[in-house]
Swiss-Prot record:
EC number: 2.1.1.182
Domain of life where this protein originates: Bacteria
HAMAP family membership: 16SrRNA_methyltr_A
Subcellular location: Cytoplasm
Organism of this sequence: Burkholderia cenocepacia (strain ATCC BAA-245 / DSM 16553 / LMG 16656 / NCTC 13227 / J2315 / CF5610) (Burkholderia cepacia (strain J2315))
The name this protein goes by in its record: Ribosomal RNA small subunit methyltransferase A
Family: Belongs to the class I-like SAM-binding methyltransferase superfamily. rRNA adenine N(6)-methyltransferase family. RsmA subfamily.
Amino acid sequence: MSNSRQHQGHFARKRFGQNFLVDHGVIDSIVATIGPARGQRMVEIGPGLGALTEPLIERLATPESPLHAVELDRDLIGRLQQRFGALLELHAGDALAFDFRSLAAPGDKPSLRIVGNLPYNISSPLLFHLMTFADAVVDQHFMLQNEVVERMVAEPGTKAFSRLSVMLQYRYVMEKMLDVPPESFQPPPKVDSAIVRMIPYEPHELPDVDPVLLGEIVSAAFSQRRKMLRNTLGDYRETIDFDALGFDLARRAEDVSVAEYVGVAQALAAVRKAG
C-alpha cells in the first residue's frame, strides 16, 4: 500500500486527522458488524471519500430517509453531494460542536445510530461530546486507534483502565468488535485500529448519579495515577466519609471499579446537598 497522502484525487489533511479506509474486505466486515437496515436513522461522522458511506446508503437510505453525515472538510462535502445526491444529507461542521440530538426522531425513544471512522486526534473529546446525547442513541460503531478501544473496554486493575474507561463504562455497554491493520488505510496510520460497539444503558439501568460530580471525582483520582488515592482524593477526606463507604484509599485509581466511583460521587452529592 502506498504511503501517499493522496487518494482519489484528494490529499489527506493532517489537521483533520484524515486516513481513508480502502480495504474492501475490512469495509464489508464493518458494514456487517453495523447491520444497517432500511428506515433506520443513521449518522456517519467524517464520511471522508465515502468508503463506508456507499455501502451504508445501499442498505438503508431512500430520498425520504437519507443517511446523515457530519463532515468538516468542505472539499469533501462537494464531492459527496455530487456522488450521492438526495440519499445523503450532509451537515457541514465540526462534530465536536454538532448537536446530534437535532437529528433524532421526535419523542423520547432512542432513534439514532451513529457510526464513523473517527479522527484519532480528537477521539476522546468527541466520545465525551457524544455522551451528552446518549439518551437519543440506539448504538454507536466507531473506528478508533486500538489503544483507545483497549482503554474504553479495560477492566479495573489493568494498566489500560483510565478516566475514559470509567466515564464511558458508566454510560455504555461496550465491546471491541474488529481489529483493523494500518495497511487498510490510505495513507496508513502509524497505529493499529479497531472497531468498537457502544450501546447506551437505558434510563432505568443507569445509577442515580450526577455525571458532572462523577467526572470530578474520576478526574481527581486519575490526575496522578501512580499515587495512592489518599493523595489524589485527599481534598475530599473532610467531606466524604470514605470509611463508611468501605472505600479503601490505599489503592491507585486503576484499582477502583466503576460502581465504587459512582458511590463516592453519590456521597459527595449528598454532602453538598445537605450543606
